Amino acid sequence: MLLHFSKMHGLGNDFMVVDNVTQNLYVNPDQIRRWADRHTGIGFDQMLLVEPPYDPDLDFHYRIFNADGSEVAQCGNGARCFAKFVKAKNLSNKNHLKVSTKAGKMVLHLEKDGQVTVDMGEPLFEPAAVPFKAQKAEQTYVLRVKEETVLCGVLGLGNPHCVIAVDNVDTTPVETLGAALAAHERFPESVNVGFMQKVSADEIKLRVFERGVGETRACGSGACAAAVAGIQQGLLNERVKVSLPGGDLIIRWQQGQPVKMTGPAELVYDGQMVL
C-alpha cells in the first residue's frame, strides 16, 4: 500500500497529517513511534488523522496521536493544520468546518488572511472532569513536587492542563519540572504543564511540556489553558497574545463562553511511503 501524507506545522509544533477519508490506514502505537523518530522516521510531535464523520451534521472526525503512540483528545495547533489540510486536499470547500474529536466537537474557521480560528470549547474546572484529584474546584492549587511547592491553575480543555506563573520562562527548568508534574499522582491521566510569564494584562510568554511528547515549540490548547487560567485569576484581559518559542497566538475568552484561538498553519511538504 502506498500511503500519502503531509508534513505540517503550527508555530513549529509539527505533524504528520493523513487523509483517512480516501485512504484506509490502521495505525498502532509501535508504528507511530517509528514514524515519529526524527532520526530514522518522518519526525513529528503528533500524528493527525482526517476521518469521515460519525454524525451527518459534522464534516469530519479528527484523531490525534502523540509521538509515543498514545491517542489524545485535543490538539489546538493540529486543529489549525487540519483545517488547512482538508481545504488543500479538496476534501471540503468550506471555510467553516464542524469536526468531532475524542473530547467532543470543535468548530474551525479559515480566515481570509490565511490564519485559522479554532473554537476550542468551554474549559472545565471541576477536578473530576479534568481529571485531577481534589476535593473541590479552586482557582489555584498547591502541589508538592521535586521537594518544592508550586502554585498552579488546573483545568481541562480537551486535555488536562496545569498552569504555573513564573518570573522568567527562559530560566525555568521546563523539562525536569514538567516531567515531574506530568507524573504527579494527582493527575491520573498525566497532564500538559504550562509555564507562564506575564508581560502585561494583554500578553504572556509561555513554554509548555506536553505529556507523551516533552517540551514543544508551541501548544495551542496549552496557550488557551494559560490564557484562561490568567483571566480567571484576574491577571489578564479577555484578549491575550501568547508568545511561544515557535511564534504567537491570539486567545480570546469570556467566562462561561468557548475559548477562541487564532493562529497560522503551514504545509512543509507532501510525501508518500510504501507500507
Swiss-Prot record:
A single MF term (Gene Ontology): diaminopimelate epimerase activity
A single Gene Ontology CC term: cytosol
Positions of the record's site feature: Important for dimerization: Y269
Cysteine-cysteine disulfides: none
Residues annotated as the enzyme's active site: C75 (proton donor), C219 (proton acceptor)
Substrates-to-products reaction catalysed: (2S,6S)-2,6-diaminopimelate = meso-2,6-diaminopimelate
Main subcellular location of this protein, as a coarse class: cytoplasm
Cross-referenced Pfam families: DAP_epimerase
Compartments (UniProt record): Cytoplasm
Site (Could be important to modulate the pK values of the two catalytic cysteine residues): H161, E210
Enzyme class label: isomerase
Stored Gene3D superfamilies: Diaminopimelate Epimerase, Chain A, domain 1 (3.10.310.10)
EC number: 5.1.1.7
BP GO terms, sorted: lysine biosynthetic process via diaminopimelate
Domain of life: Bacteria
Biological function: Catalyzes the stereoinversion of LL-2,6-diaminopimelate (L,L-DAP) to meso-diaminopimelate (meso-DAP), a precursor of L-lysine and an essential component of the bacterial peptidoglycan.
HAMAP family the UniProt entry points to: DAP_epimerase
PANTHER family given in the database record: DIAMINOPIMELATE EPIMERASE, DIAMINOPIMELATE EPIMERASE, CHLOROPLASTIC
Similarity comment: Belongs to the diaminopimelate epimerase family.
Protein name: Diaminopimelate epimerase
